[in-house]
């Protein structure tokens, strides 16, 4: 069957139940009427558009150990893929470096998204079956408390030049490493989710919504109850070959948080960073 990703009104009385249901069934949910200021999102996008078009972006090359800073075009590949993704991006942490041209609005958005994510984690915790919630080493909301690795990734997918490696796309099929991803609407279409029939489905780009998906760490902590669903970003049609910008917030537990008998959050993160070429 195809995925039935629910669109949920953040303010509805049964929003928590519907959100958990959608995440359980599909690994994704769409939230409307959320508390994030739409003008703020647009202003942050504009600041980063200016950053990526400047030569000074190279003054902030990423730190391989800390993983903050600027990751140039063709740096990252999906797990199991040899082709590099057609994107450049910047990693924002609470403690990390920020470009001089970027004002305080980015960090304000970071904190607003983190607050929403904390609420969403409490919704999952509340509605998880007892046999699932008892698997969590600590409550989900507590996993990210004072985490140093909650990451806002600002992504720029440049227009295609026509000289790209064969079969390379903006973001190859992958699953997210982290616990939960909160994604404000991208500036252009392109995000797709793989359904149970191995068909790719477009995800909404409604600028008044945020898209949520569960990652590998939630999948592991719940013993596969919450799926980490495969998704990708496809290349644009020739008539819409323009830049695309995206801002996912990746919620990461603290390093010492136990996911299952084989992994802590820290050990799994390091393993995956090596697999995708960032270590």
Name every feature range the model reports, one short phrase each.
Residues 1-279:
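Peripheral, non-catalytic segments flanking oxidoreductase cores
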């Amino acid at each position: 069957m195809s995925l039935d990703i629910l669109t949920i009104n953040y303010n509805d009385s049964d929003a928590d139940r519907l959100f958990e249901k959608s995440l359980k069934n599909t690994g994704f949910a769409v939230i409307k009427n959320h508390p994030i200021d739409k003008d703020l999102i647009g202003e942050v996008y504009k600041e980063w558009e200016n950053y990526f078009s400047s030569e000074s972006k190279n003054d902030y090359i990423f730190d391989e150990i800390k993983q903050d800073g600027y990751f140039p075009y063709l740096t990252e590949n999906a797990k199991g893929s040899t082709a590099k993704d057609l994107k450049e991006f910047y990693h924002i942490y609470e403690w990390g470096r920020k470009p001089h041209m970027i004002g305080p609005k980015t960090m304000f958005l970071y904190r607003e998204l983190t607050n929403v994510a904390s609420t969403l984690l409490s919704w999952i915790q509340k509605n998880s079956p007892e046999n699932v919630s008892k698997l969590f080493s600590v409550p989900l909301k507590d996993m990210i408390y004072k985490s140093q690795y909650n990451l806002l990734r600002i992504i720029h997918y440049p227009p295609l030049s026509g000289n790209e490696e064969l079969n390379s796309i903006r973001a190859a099929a992958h699953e997210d490493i982290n616990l939960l991803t909160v994604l404000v609407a991208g500036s252009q279409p392109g995000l797709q989710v793989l359904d149970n029939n191995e068909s790719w489905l477009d995800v909404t780009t409604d600028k008044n919504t945020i898209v949520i998906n569960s990652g590998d760490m939630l999948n592991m902590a719940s013993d596969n109850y919450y799926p980490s669903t495969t998704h990708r970003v496809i290349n644009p049609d020739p008539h819409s070959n323009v830049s695309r910008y995206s801002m996912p917030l990746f919620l990461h537990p603290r390093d010492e948080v136990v996911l299952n008998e084989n992994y802590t959050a820290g050990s799994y993160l390091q393993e995956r960073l090596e697999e995708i070429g960032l270590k």
